[in-house]
Design a protein with these regions (language model features):
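Conserved RecA-like P-loop NTPase helicase motor core
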Residues: 308-420
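Interdomain helical connector at the RecA1-RecA2 junction of SF1/SF2 helicase-like NTPases
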Residues: 188-280
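SF2 helicase catalytic motif II
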Residues: 128-131, 141-178, 182-183
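Conserved helicase motor "Helicase C" RecA-like lobe of SF1/SF2 P-loop NTPases
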Residues: 290-313
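Walker A/P-loop
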Residues: 34-57
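Long, largely alpha-helical accessory region at the distal end of helicase-like NTP-driven motors
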Residues: 253-255, 259-262, 266, 270, ...
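Conserved Walker A/P-loop ATP-binding site and its immediately adjacent core
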Residues: 56, 60-93, 290-293
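Inter-Walker segment of RecA-like/P-loop motor cores
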Residues: 89-135
Length: 447
């Protein structure tokens, strides 16, 4: 099976692709041209075209089948949307292949897929749960170790987990490309693979590939605390710190109805301002709660102020969850409340205001949730970029998120500075240019 090496594709000079996608692809192809190179890491910010990069990465690299591993169902669906043979097919819409006959055969791995179907596929994608494990239906128990030549790990910060290690160990002969938008892990484990390309968030902000970002914190009330240790007494933050830690304070603030309502009111204010400035764009608030019960309370508080609310969490039945996503896509919601469900892979470009009602300890988790509002709204839909693609992150001043935000603030500041980029030269470009110059020289002699 030599589809990925024999099919003519339009990638390096393709004006429909984004510069970070092309630059990353060039680095991928050059890296794996050395047989000694087996494992690489590419960092591409959310909203920059990671799914598109995954779709072009195998060309000129893979000698046979490709396996794409995703961490969960939502991320898997994002990959599937890119690769479906429908009107949204990436290879056709972005002029990657020159004929619909050249589209690769793509299959989602399911327990009931036939062996014949697997063998005829060029690309197989699945969430990690269906690939690893002791179940007879797991992919590693159905195909030989050399079935794939190239494995692409989406959301690579999960790769150090045991289930991922098991899959990569089984297919150890394959080349491995890790792709992530957030190169941080909360458990201090290093993401595998040699970093061969990293596009800074500031660069894609400057190019307007993603929304700009800004932060606004609220602290409308003077904070007082109560505790059973000292009943009937209002305690200041300084009083509490004498016998409680900072984490206790941050959790208390996150779960406080009064503090939550401060964030709710500010997020609604910003939504109203946004809709007044750009009434045709269905902007929405993404609110992130601590738990399902907390999310239900947030929903009641938002609804009490006249907003339409959709809740998404992992305990919902599939049918209810599908209805919830449909309501979001059909703009039957002003507020989407999530409990660790939308953190990866869900792309809805109209999520423009992020209201955070919980503390974070992991920079990866914080980066994931901020990434959900990064996707830019297309130019043909907006009033102005600085209005519609200017994401707002809102949280309480005392919830402990300011240190997390500093990472993004540095990127925001860098994005405001104009940088003249150096040219990127490849060996292929050099050879082509050399031939061109020779022909020019030859023409001059004839004259």
């Amino acid at each position: 099976m030599t589809y990925f090496t024999n099919t003519a594709v339009n990638i390096e000079g393709n004006r429909k692709l984004r510069t970070p996608q092309i630059e990353a692809y060039i680095k991928i192809r050059e890296f794996f041209s050395d047989p000694e190179h087996r494992e690489a890491l590419v960092i591409l910010p959310t909203g920059t075209g990671k799914s598109g990069l995954i779709s072009i990465a195998p060309y000129g690299v893979s000698q046979k089948r490709v396996l794409i591993i995703t961490p969960g169902l939502v991320t898997k669906d994002s990959i599937r949307k890119t690769q479906e043979v429908l009107e949204d097919n990436f290879w056709i819409n972005y002029d990657i292949v020159f004929s619909s006959k050249d589209i690769p055969v793509v299959s989602e791995y399911t327990p009931d897929i036939s062996s014949e179907h697997l063998e005829q596929s060029h690309i197989i994608f699945s969430n990690i749960q269906r690939i690893s494990g002791n179940r007879k239906s797991a992919l590693i128990n159905r195909v030989p170790e050399d079935f794939f030549d190239f494995i692409i790990v989406d959301e690579a910060h999960h790769a150090p987990a045991q289930s991922w290690r098991d899959a990569l160990k089984y297919f150890s002969k394959a080349k491995v490309l890790h792709v992530t938008g957030t190169p941080y892990r909360g458990d201090a484990q290093e993401i595998p693979g040699e970093i061969i390309h990293e596009t800074p968030l500031s660069e894609v902000m400057r190019a307007k590939y993603v929304k700009w970002l800004r932060k606004e914190t609220v602290n409308a009330h003077e904070l007082y605390f109560t505790t059973p240790d000292i009943p009937n007494k209002k305690l200041t933050k300084e009083d509490i710190l004498e016998f409680k830690d900072k984490e206790w304070i941050e959790k208390s603030i996150a779960l406080s109805p009064e503090c939550s309502n401060d964030v709710i009111e500010h997020s609604i204010l910003k939504l109203n301002i946004l809709k007044e400035a750009s009434p045709k764009v269905p902007h929405k608030i993404l609110a992130v709660g601590c738990s399902i019960t907390h999310a239900e309370d947030l929903a009641k508080w938002y609804e009490a102020k006249g907003l339409r609310v959709v809740i998404i969490h992992s305990e919902m039945d599939d049918e209810v969850k599908a209805d919830a996503f449909l309501n979001i896509e059909n703009h039957n919601a002003d507020v989407v409340i999530s409990v660790n469900m939308l953190m990866e892979g869900y792309d809805h470009k109209y999520l423009s205001i992020l209201a955070i009602f919980r503390p974070y300890r992991s920079l990866n988790a914080f980066a994931q949730v901020v990434g959900r509002i990064l996707r830019a709204i297309p130019e043909n839909e907006i009033t102005a970029f600085e209005i519609d693609n200017n994401g707002i992150v809102i949280f309480h001043e005392e919830i402990g998120l300011n240190p997390m935000w500093e990472k993004f603030q540095s990127e925001v500041d860098r994005a405001k500075r104009t940088i003249n980029r150096e040219y990127t030269f490849t060996d292929d470009y050099y050879r082509e240019r050399e031939n061109f110059l020779r022909s020019e020289e030859h023409t001059s002699e004839l004259q």
